[in-house]
């Protein structure tokens, strides 16, 4: 499947994990910088090396103890535990200047128990003897990779090794059907909704939060249409780590969203709409995914509570007026069947096609009804439009002075396209391109070339008449 591998960076504080994270992600901003209610010492980013994509996690929370005593729990936070168990590959960053200390040895022992690929990176080798990394052979995790992450030295070699067995993006086999992701905070009813959508008990449901693990793909048919449900529900029973209740799996949520065509976010009506719900909605929109909102456990509310939630929906969802919101009860099945039409409309909207002629006509109608403003005495001209992509749909508009088009006018055009094509549930990207003169960088413009051609004809004609009029000697 096309789910991205996960690489977790672990190690003591100040060994260079964040610097290596920035090198991997090319200093891009972390995908999730601060999700409400989550430990803030983890960052998540997208990385690509030679067309091989993966998610990189910068973990925190490993202690400074250097006496080598105590259990691994003394050194590692619950969130770091979670990141390590979700990862496909572990990069263990150590400090070549400081040398190996007790905490490094304790973490190394723990990593031996995981059965996952582990790469030891001896960072900060600049200014130390070439033999300094050799000390970390004692960890028993293979050859240490010398690196100076702050200068980028050694990063390329590590990436080449890390990605050697990862699939190329163009070689990934996609499952057949509309890919539907079910996301939401813990215990909002995701697994119950999955069972309702599938119409059978395909997923075990638990009442306590934190019983979710890896995303799984469930292909199924409904009304003759193919679907692939990307579900983050399952059972955690994989050793000591699983005795801890996981608060939230950011990695699996990001993977499910990115790999979906349509995302359904489940919100607990009893808890109301919280910031974490909005963060997940925001990420789905940033990823360009079509969206449907399901307010679950609706039947358990009083009339006053329902009125309050409706007011909250109007207030907190005002930035997504094009997204359909459903009130459902996954447990009893109320309203669940109504999700499918919204899911299909959102998907169709995200993949819509239209001819350039038709799109340009809609553009011209919008411009006629409400012309663009003038800039420096010249009116901005928008000449034609065409489709530039899908999921999310992209409309490309060509014209002059497009860089000066106000945001308010850009939103006006987006709303016009939404209304005409009845786009529901999907972000819409409207991109503006400046018309370029193809002869701008050439010595001859069409006008100049035409002039020279006419002059040459005149010279030829004059020469012809001169020759004709000459008398023979």
Swiss-Prot record:
Organism this protein belongs to: Psychrobacter arcticus (strain DSM 17307 / VKM B-2377 / 273-4)
EngA-type G domain mapped to chain residues: 5-170, 178-351
Residue span, KH-like domain: 352-436
Disulfide bonds listed in the record: none
Keyword Transcription regulation set for record: no
Protein name in UniProt: GTPase Der
Assigned protein family: Belongs to the TRAFAC class TrmE-Era-EngA-EngB-Septin-like GTPase superfamily. EngA (Der) GTPase family.
Entry-linked HAMAP family: GTPase_Der
Pfam short name (any one): KH_dom-like
Stretch list, region Disordered: 438-473
